[in-house]
């Protein structure tokens, strides 16, 4: 894996695209160099503010991937991102157009589900995205009002629009679990990276370095695929929630129309 430097990080951030592969590849590189986490976060924030509006959301996705996938190796990134992440969310939200503003909220929802940060940080993030429109606690009566207000005239976020569902389904057509090429690459990994008994074959420094490189390449491949699978699981959970909300509201809408039709029949 390439050596770390501030210039190398700046270059990689400038080349970052919004593809899942690009985000996860850079995330793995950053996690590998996590001893530089403070500098990485500083450069990330600086480059985020310099990035064009259509690239800012990708920086947030990168931070999400790094924070979540580095936790099992150490708290460095979670701790170093904490002082800047609220302002970063505000910045991305303010610079995004209306169609993209829901995406930071999706990242926040995942962090809430997984308790990525303490409640006080999550509350600050909620305030950064929603202001006073989304309070932390609601009464039972308020929740029931929200549930009963679902109709075709409701906000576009409740329920999801048909095009949002179609888009989510289309994105899953290229999901990691269906990537035959990666399946084949994993199946074709050399036996040397799977069987520890073959370590006895190492007879000199050169053969040891060759094996080390094979293991590193295999780890990169598997870590990348694991990250893609984790993202796919999140996408499928989100789609399940969207479908559930959509079906519930459609049933309520149908029941409302049937009731109105019955009233008309009685009147006539």
Swiss-Prot record:
Subcellular location: Nucleus
Matches recorded under InterPro entries: CID_dom, ENTH_VHS, RPRD1A/B_C, RPRD1A_CID
Organism superkingdom: Eukaryota
Keywords: Nucleus
GO cellular component, one term: nucleus
The keyword Disulfide bond is annotated on this UniProt entry: no
Residues in CID domain copies: 1-133
A molecular function (GO) term: RNA polymerase II complex binding
PROSITE patterns xref list: CID (PS51391)
Biological-process GO terms, alphabetical: mRNA 3'-end processing; RNA polymerase II promoter clearance
Its job: Interacts with phosphorylated C-terminal heptapeptide repeat domain (CTD) of the largest RNA polymerase II subunit POLR2A, and participates in dephosphorylation of the CTD by RPAP2. May act as a negative regulator of cyclin-D1 (CCND1) and cyclin-E (CCNE1) in the cell cycle.
Subunit and interaction comment: May form a heterodimer with RPRD1B. Associates with the RNA polymerase II subunit POLR2A (via CTD phosphorylated at 'Ser-2' and 'Ser-7' of the heptad repeats).
Family affiliation: Belongs to the UPF0400 (RTT103) family.
Protein name listed in UniProt: Regulation of nuclear pre-mRNA domain-containing protein 1A
Species for this entry: Gallus gallus (Chicken)
């Amino acid at each position: 894996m390439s050596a770390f430097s501030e210039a190398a990080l700046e270059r990689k951030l400038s080349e970052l695209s919004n593809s899942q592969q690009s985000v996860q590849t850079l995330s793995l590189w950053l996690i590998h160099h996590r001893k530089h986490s403070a500098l990485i976060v500083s450069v990330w924030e600086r480059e985020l503010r310099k990035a064009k509006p259509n690239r800012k959301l990708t920086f947030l996705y990168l931070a999400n991937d790094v924070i979540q996938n580095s936790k099992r190796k150490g708290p460095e990134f979670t701790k170093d991102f904490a002082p800047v992440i609220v302002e970063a969310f505000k910045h991305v939200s303010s610079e995004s157009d209306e169609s993209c503003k829901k995406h930071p909220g999706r990242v926040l929802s995942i962090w809430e589900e997984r308790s990525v940060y303490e409640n006080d940080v999550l509350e600050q993030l909620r305030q950064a995205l929603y202001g006073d429109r989304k309070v932390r606690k609601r009464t039972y009566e308020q929740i029931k009002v929200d549930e009963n207000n679902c109709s075709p005239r409701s906000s576009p976020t409740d329920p999801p629009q048909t095009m949002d569902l179609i888009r989510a389904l289309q994105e899953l057509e290229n999901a990691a679990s269906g990537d035959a090429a990666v399946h084949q690459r994993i199946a074709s990994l050399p036996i040397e990276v799977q069987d520890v008994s073959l370590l006895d074959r190492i007879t000199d420094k050169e053969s040891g370095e060759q094996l080390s490189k094979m293991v590193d390449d295999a780890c990169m491949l598997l870590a990348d695929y694991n990250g893609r699978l984790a993202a796919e699981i999140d996408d499928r959970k989100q789609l399940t929630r969207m479908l559930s909300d959509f079906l519930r509201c459609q049933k309520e809408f149908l029941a409302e129309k049937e009731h109105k039709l019955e009233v008309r029949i009685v009147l006539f």
